[in-house]
Swiss-Prot record:
Disulfide bonds: none annotated. GO terms for molecular function: large ribosomal subunit rRNA binding; structural constituent of ribosome. Belongs to the universal ribosomal protein uL10 family. Part of the ribosomal stalk of the 50S ribosomal subunit. The N-terminus interacts with L11 and the large rRNA to form the base of the stalk. The C-terminus forms an elongated spine to which L12 dimers bind in a sequential fashion forming a multimeric L10(L12)X complex. The gene is rplJ. The lineage of its organism: Bacteria, Pseudomonadati, Pseudomonadota, Alphaproteobacteria, Sphingomonadales. Gene3D superfamilies: 3.30.70.1730, 6.10.250.290. GO terms for cellular component: large ribosomal subunit. This is Large ribosomal subunit protein uL10. It holds the Pfam family Ribosomal_L10.
Length: 170
């Protein structure tokens, strides 16, 4: 890797760290190509990115971002999973880790808060941003629906009463 490629890699990783809502650091221990491809596919489907990077370049890229606390985690064969949704990357990595023992969750971070493996697993158990939005919209719509039902119910009852009087009179 020449100097320009290294600079390009650092710039790319810096962009990933700048846009990420959460970052998960993993250690791949003898994964097959098929497993690695499956992991990358699962992470991509979750809307996250997954990058195997040289530790020295990752340490340079993380400097000046909220994720500077991750510097100590970049030892050994590490990979970086990052997503704008704070839960997506963690959820994808934890779900994949359940299927194989070839991947180790080293830790992660959400903003400047550094997480250990248990913290990443706890983050993965939380609902995603889309799930929270759906729940919130459901909660907001429920009172409006009830109000609409209440405002139309008296009018419908009144119409039935008038209809009954009209039938009696006829």
């Amino acid at each position: 890797m020449d100097r320009s490629q290294k600079a390009e890699s650092v710039a790319f990783l810096n962009g990933v760290f700048a846009e990420a809502g959460a970052v998960v650091i993993t250690r791949n221990l003898g994964m097959t190509v098929a497993q690695s491809t499956a992991l990358r596919t699962k992470i991509r489907e979750a809307g996250a990115t997954y990058k195997v990077a040289k530790n020295s370049l990752a340490k340079l890229a993380v400097a000046g971002t909220d994720y500077e606390g991750l510097v100590d985690l970049f030892t050994g064969p590490t990979a970086i999973a990052a997503s704008a949704d704070p839960v997506a990357a963690a959820k994808a990595v934890v779900e994949f880790a359940k299927t194989t023992d070839k991947i180790e969750i080293v830790g992660g971070a959400m903003g400047s808060q550094v997480l250990n493996e248990a913290g990443v697993r706890a983050l993965a158990s939380m609902p995603s941003l889309d799930e929270l939005r759906g729940t919130l919209i459901g909660l907001i719509q429920a009172p409006a629906t009830k109000i609409a039902q209440l405002t139309t119910a008296p009018a419908a009852k009144l119409a039935r009463v008038f209809g009954a009087y009209a039938k009696e009179a006829a």
